[in-house]
């Protein structure tokens, strides 16, 4: 029997719950926190569901597996890193050395959530090189792999410009890009938010060493004079709607 028009209109105007897109974002945020703090292998997929406030089986509506979720986290993080790199380097296009320093300092301007994300990227990078038989996992893996290459290419192109301008010595730009990124990424093997060192102290040390790898003289006095930067404690906007994993490892 057709329902009264008023009832149909009322139902159309009823408030809706969180969209699939926002729920997916919440899962990614919570998984980043949990995987980053506890370690990917030691984290339980069911704990992600509990923190988001959904049943374990509901996770499979968004991700085929815990590994599929990990690849998606990696792909999004790498894309964000590349966009941030291109934005900062573009803001200092007239002075390569200034741009290089700004890019390196910007790389350490991170929230605690982003630090955990970087820790996860570094610790599980090897999984990006392992072929998957599941099509969804393989597609996500290939995307993360391609975005790794895109970030390295952006760095190599940027460094080539510096060499062409005579700002840094000639070298293989791909190897130099990997050397700088490798030194930067090494921080996240050991750095922990709220540990013995502030992120600003780590940044002051590593920025100068990355500049030295590029062939520029270290400016220790300038590093000491710059104000210390600490990991920001702000919460990513999309994570505010859900709980975050707790505990440390």
Functional labels for PLM-detected ranges:
Residues 2, 26, 30, 34-68, ...:
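Helix-turn-helix
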Residues 37-41, 114, 165-166:
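Short coil/turn segments at alpha/beta junctions that flank glycine-rich nucleotide-binding fingerprints
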Residues 72, 86-117, 177-180, 220-229:
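Hydrophobic alpha-helical connector segments
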Residues 112-139:
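Amphipathic alpha-helical segments used for helix-helix packing
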């Amino acid at each position: 029997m057709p329902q009264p028009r008023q009832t149909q209109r009322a139902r159309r105007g009823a408030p809706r719950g969180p969209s699939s897109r926002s729920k997916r974002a919440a899962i990614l945020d919570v998984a980043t926190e949990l995987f980053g703090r506890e370690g990917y292998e030691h984290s339980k997929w069911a704990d992600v569901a509990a923190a988001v406030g959904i049943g374990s089986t509901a996770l499979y509506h968004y991700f085929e597996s815990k590994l599929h979720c990990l690849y998606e986290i990696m792909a999004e993080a790498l894309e964000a890193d590349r966009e941030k790199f291109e934005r900062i380097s573009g803001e200092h296009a007239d002075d390569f050395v200034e741009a290089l320093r700004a890019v390196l300092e910007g790389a350490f301007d991170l929230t605690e959530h982003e630090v955990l994300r970087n820790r996860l990227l570094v610790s599980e990078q090897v999984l990006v090189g392992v072929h998957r038989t599941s099509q969804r996992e393989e597609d996500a893996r290939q995307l993360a792999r391609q975005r790794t290459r895109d970030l390295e290419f952006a760095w190599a192109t940027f460094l080539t410009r510096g060499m062409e301008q005579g700002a840094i010595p000639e070298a293989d730009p791909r190897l130099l890009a990997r050397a700088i990124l490798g030194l930067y990424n090494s921080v996240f093997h050991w750095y922990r938010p709220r540990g013995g060192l502030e992120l600003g102290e780590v940044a002051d040390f590593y920025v100068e060493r990355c500049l030295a790898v590029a062939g520029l003289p270290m400016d220790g006095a300038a590093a000491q004079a710059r104000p210390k930067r600490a990991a920001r404690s702000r919460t990513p906007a999309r994570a505010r709607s859900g709980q975050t994993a707790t505990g440390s490892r």
